[in-house]
């Protein structure tokens, strides 16, 4: 099968099962797996939308403990004996009584060959309706606060009618608003400079009285009983009260001197929000949505002092360990994040500020709980408003497209072991026969808690081969390795759902089996390696991570490229490997690994989003797409992400996922400024100027978070966003005859892709020669 046909096949599998694998044939021994360099791994999107898939309204049929695998199309079913054999543990299980009428031609949906992904609605109802607690920073300008209030009031109409809503505001003090008290505005005030233990918060709010016990089901349509009902009200009953409270919110009254920052107790407000939910709603779906317009400057978790002369920490400060508040703040927010994750609650962080707000310190609140992270210049921006509204997108049945209190478990056959997960989750510390010896990401477990999950939430799951090799390793007949992903989550409709995806792939034959190399998915592999690199970058030095990326690339090319000794020009890669070095070139230059010109908050935001998206979107972040428009061609033409693509008579459309940029070449910009497009006879120029705008609108239509939209001309200051992403094949040092500077010239010392590839070929051939010499003359 040729590469294009394989790509189509992998794309069909992704549409059906929401999964892409780095290798689509598994090596049969651990030794063979170690020589692959790129680990066996999957990018899995559990809730990928499948509108044509039925929702089964009965409990799944599971294997006996401890296996607990769910019945799937790969199970052997004996319809006469009414038994099925589990493909994971090979145990025989009786079919339940309601399967008595099945025959070879009439089988239940979960056994259909195309039902490798199936969803069940479980009988267990959710313990409470979805909960939304808005935590609002009042230390901001009037116009920003008004815009935020308007957006929050609008969001009330997007919530399910039975959803519970609470409100906490903070500035110098944190206030929990008692929405259930209608006589006048009433709130409980917490001092911003003091750290409160969980029990203190509960005592002060009067939450220790008998309330709904954890995991005790309530009617999903009924308001909660108990003390928390004073602070959390159903939208349908209290929309008027909640709207009134929001409308009456005022700026923090505490005076701020010109040389000071506002006193902002973000840590106390978050601590109170977590304490409020964990007392009465353990393991019930809830979101704490934080809206902050500046850094925390007092109390636990503060990231900078109130004096403006004291700057926010930079990457340089962190590298030199010149960070006064960083470690203590991280410890505080990480402890809060673990509490929220253990209770199944999501924390979303929405920042509306030109300066840093402390996202770096707070990042694990979102990373541990599956929350959203959004970085915008102001709450007045359309980027914030439209992105926030998209959080509440709904399906065809008017249910929110978000899952609550989610968990993921992975089962494997004896050939495979799970080594870990990289994504927005925490370990459930569940041990089983599927857990591997090594660790990659969040390891030593086969189950993780994600809390918040949506249709684009994706996770990198990594595996190892269990078989050590030897004569007994290769067994006669076709062999396969299997994995099953079990995603439990609270659906917005009020029931728990289970989505099951079962994947089977063939095992390779003896060493040197060509099907192994042919099964390599370079796009999935690039994204999975990028996740590992970003995971390493959070704990290691940047240059060390880039060296690791380079080493892995050299090893992969040494293993799979064709070349002759001492002849770099003979270097060749198969079609399904050719783009991989290019992806790695752009990854090592990207904002995920290069922190220069980005604040620590921006770096935390970019890495957060990369770890949330599937293969297609993550690849756009690593290697942006570039399209060209000109009068010679109709529509857009994909072009190389290279400085040579800049032409005076062309318009370029760059998509980096975070930015959508329209770039006008010099001549086009001059024509536009002269107004030719408005004159008769120049309709083709007008259409040319409009085409990239229409394509940009399509790109923006369903993207979260909403990208920043930039229109610029050659030589303009905003053109730097384009130039920073292009391969610098034409720089000030490689100019043509006379050394003249053109619009294609990029002033940089970065190496070009061609130089990178030349060095790669030399290293690969040298490494191969060195390995051969070492084998011939082993070191003593």
UniProtKB/Swiss-Prot annotation:
It is a peripheral membrane protein. It comes from the Eukaryota. It is found in: Cytoplasm; Cytoplasmic vesicle, COPII-coated vesicle membrane; Endoplasmic reticulum membrane; Golgi apparatus membrane. CDD domains: Sec23-like (cd01478), Sec23_C (cd11287). GO terms for biological process: COPII-coated vesicle cargo loading; intracellular protein transport. Its main location: cytoplasm. The COPII coat is composed of at least 5 proteins: the sec23/24 complex, the sec13/31 complex, and the protein sar1. Belongs to the SEC23/SEC24 family. SEC23 subfamily. Component of the coat protein complex II (COPII) which promotes the formation of transport vesicles from the endoplasmic reticulum (ER). The coat has two main functions, the physical deformation of the endoplasmic reticulum membrane into vesicles and the selection of cargo molecules. This is Protein transport protein sec23. It comes from Aspergillus fumigatus (strain ATCC MYA-4609 / CBS 101355 / FGSC A1100 / Af293) (Neosartorya fumigata). The gene is sec23.
């Amino acid at each position: 099968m040729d590469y294009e046909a394989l790509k189509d096949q992998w794309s069909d599998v992704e549409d059906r099962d929401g999964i892409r694998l780095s290798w689509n044939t598994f090596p049969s021994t651990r030794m063979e797996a170690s020589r692959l360099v790129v680990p066996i791994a999957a990018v899995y999107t559990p809730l990928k939308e499948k509108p044509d898939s039925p929702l089964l309204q009965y409990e799944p049929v599971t294997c006996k403990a401890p296996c607990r695998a769910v019945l799937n199309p790969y199970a052997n079913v004996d319809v006469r004996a009414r038994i099925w054999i589990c493909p994971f543990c090979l145990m025989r299980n009786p079919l339940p009584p309601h399967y008595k009428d099945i025959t070879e031609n009439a089988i239940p949906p979960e056994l259909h060959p195309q039902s490798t992904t199936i969803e069940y609605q479980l009988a267990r109802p959710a313990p409470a309706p979805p909960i939304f607690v808005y935590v609002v920073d009042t230390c901001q300008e009037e116009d920003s606060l008004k815009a935020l209030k308007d957006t929050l009031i609008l969001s009330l109409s997007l919530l399910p009618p039975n959803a519970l809503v609470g409100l906490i505001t903070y500035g110098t003090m944190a206030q929990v608003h008692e929405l259930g008290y209608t006589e006048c505005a009433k709130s409980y005030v917490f001092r911003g400079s003091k750290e409160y233990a969980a029990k203190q918060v509960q005592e002060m709010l009067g939450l220790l009285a008998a309330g709904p016990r954890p995991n005790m089901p309530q009617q999903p349509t009924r308001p909660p009983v108990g003390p928390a009902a004073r602070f959390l009200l159903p939208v349908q009953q209290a929309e008027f009260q909640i709207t009134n409270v929001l409308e009456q919110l005022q700026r923090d009254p505490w005076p701020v001197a010109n040389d000071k920052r506002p006193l902002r107790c973000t840590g106390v407000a978050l601590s109170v929000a977590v304490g409020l939910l964990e007392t009465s709603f353990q393991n019930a779906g809830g979101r704490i949505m934080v809206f902050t317009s500046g850094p925390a400057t007092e109390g636990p978790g503060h990231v900078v002092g109130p004096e403006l002369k004291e700057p926010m920490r930079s990457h340089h400060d962190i590298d030199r360990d010149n960070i006064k508040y960083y470690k203590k703040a991280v410890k505080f927010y990480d402890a809060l994040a673990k509490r929220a994750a253990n209770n199944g609650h999501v924390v979303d962080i929405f920042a509306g500020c030109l300066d840093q707000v402390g996202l770096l310190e707070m990042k694990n609140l979102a990373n541990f709980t599956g929350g959203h992270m959004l970085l915008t210049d102001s709450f007045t921006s359309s980027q914030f408003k439209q992105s926030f509204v998209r959080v509440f997108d709904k399906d065809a049945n008017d249910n929110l497209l978000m899952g609550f209190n989610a968990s993921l478990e992975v089962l494997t056959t004896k050939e495979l072991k799970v080594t870990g997960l990289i994504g927005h989750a925490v370990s459930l510390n569940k041990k089983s026969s599927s857990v591997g010896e090594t660790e990659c990401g969040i390891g030593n477990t086969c189950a993780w808690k994600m809390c918040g999950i949506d249709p684009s939430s994706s996770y990198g799951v990594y595996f190892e081969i269990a078989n050590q090799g030897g004569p007994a390793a290769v067994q006669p007949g076709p062999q396969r390795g299997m994995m099953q992903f079990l995603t439990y989550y609270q659906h917005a409709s009020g029931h728990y759902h289970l989505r099951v995806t079962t994947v089977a792939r063939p095992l390779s034959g003896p060493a040197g089996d060509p099907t192994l190399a042919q099964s390599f998915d370079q796009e999935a592999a690039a994204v999975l390696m990028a996740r590992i690199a970003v995971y390493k970058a959070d704990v290691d030095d940047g240059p060390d991570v880039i060296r690791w990326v380079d080493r892995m690339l050299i090893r992969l090319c040494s293993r799979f490229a064709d070349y002759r000794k001492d002849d770099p020009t003979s270097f060749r890669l198969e079609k399904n490997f050719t783009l991989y070095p290019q992806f790695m070139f752009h990854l090592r230059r990207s904002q995920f690994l290069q922190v220069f010109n980005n604040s620590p908050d921006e770096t935390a935001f970019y890495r957060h989003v990369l770890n949330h998206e599937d293969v297609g979107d993550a690849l756009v972040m690593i290697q942006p797409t570039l399209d060209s428009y000109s009068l010679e061609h109709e529509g857009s033409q994909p072009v190389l992400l290279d400085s040579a693509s800049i032409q005076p008579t062309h318009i370029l459309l760059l998509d980096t996922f975070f930015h959508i940029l329209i770039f006008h070449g010099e001549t086009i910009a001059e024509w536009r400024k002269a107004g030719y497009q408005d004159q008769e006879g120049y309709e083709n120029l007008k259409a040319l100027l409009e085409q990239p705008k229409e394509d940009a609108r399509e790109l923006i239509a369903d993207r979260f978070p909403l990208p920043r939209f930039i229109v610029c001309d050659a030589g303009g200051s905003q053109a730097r966003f384009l130039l920073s992403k292009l391969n610098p094949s034409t720089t000030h040092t490689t100019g043509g005859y006379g050394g003249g500077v053109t619009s294609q010239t990029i002033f940089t010392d970065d190496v070009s892709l061609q130089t990178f590839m030349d060095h790669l070929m030399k290293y690969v051939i040298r490494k191969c020669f060195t390995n051969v010499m070492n084998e011939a003359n082993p070191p003593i």
